[in-house]
Amino acid sequence: MASDRPIFILGCPRSGGTLLRRMLRAHPRIAIPPETRLLLDAYEHRGAYGDLRRRANRQALAEWIVAGAGTRFDGLGLDARAVAEEIVAGPPTLGSALEIAWRAYARRLGKPRWGDKRPGYVQHIDALLRLFPDAQLVHVIRDGRACVADLKGTSWWRMGVYHAIATWTQAIDAGTSAAERLPSSAYTEVQYERLVTDPESELRRLCTFLTEDYAPEMASQRPEPPAEAGLERWERELCEAVMNERLRAYGYEPTEAARPATRHLARYATITAHRRLAARKRAVLDAHLRAAEPQPVASCLS
């Protein structure tokens, strides 16, 4: 029996999430829109909307969803007023309000099942599952060296190589944790290289996970040309030193790169320490927000 569980695509940026989104979008039952900035932003600022059992608070949330700066709602091609009215009339939870927007997108395309894609979701799996407890998570994984090289070649990545390496390793670690604690029906992994070289086999496996029939048109999608800028020798050395066991776990063989210079290892260690501290601060803030929640946040629609 086909499922209506929401689907979330996540992973390190430049891992192939956009390709997988296009593949799933080609399925006759699945609608996954271009990236928005709705879910994480709404969740992190949920305290600002107060008790959503109050109509005025639902109205404020609805107005932010359809017209807030930077939400990218306009990319969904929806009637903003109609969606806002549906949110105000809908169940009084944050997850429900968000789901109404994505359901409207799927409805516009004549499809019964919705999903969403954003790489950063991999660091916010707990938030996803609080909002959508029945969600199915699809983690797209790519050779970390290729991800870092690809990030270097993009115009929007301004955080440098150290942060690119840390972003990949933290995504892998978050996925490992999810795989250990979530049921196999809630989390799966897809490797970019297999999507490119043998898309039908990888997509058939994914459709089994999603409880969907395989649709041949999914495999007709092709990857965009990579933005790879290439790795300098010290960058490859650092990648392989840091990623080594994680690469091997997914069948990516390290080369015989030399040990990276101490200054590069030290700089990387400093950056990862700062990132861990920032993550702990976010966790403390989230705990305070949870304690102050006037009612559950989970969607009542799924």
Predicted regions and their residues:
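PAPS-dependent sulfation machinery
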Residues: 32-116, 121
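A generic secondary-structure signal for well-formed alpha-helical elements
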Residues: 27-34, 210-214
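ATP-binding Walker
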Residues: 15
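PAPS-dependent sulfotransferases, especially Golgi type II membrane carbohydrate sulfotransferases
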Residues: 1-8, 91, 152-155, 176-180, ...
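P-loop (Walker A) phosphate-binding loop of NTP-binding proteins
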Residues: 12
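Active-site micro-motifs of SAM-dependent methyltransferase domains
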Residues: 26, 38, 146, 194-197, ...
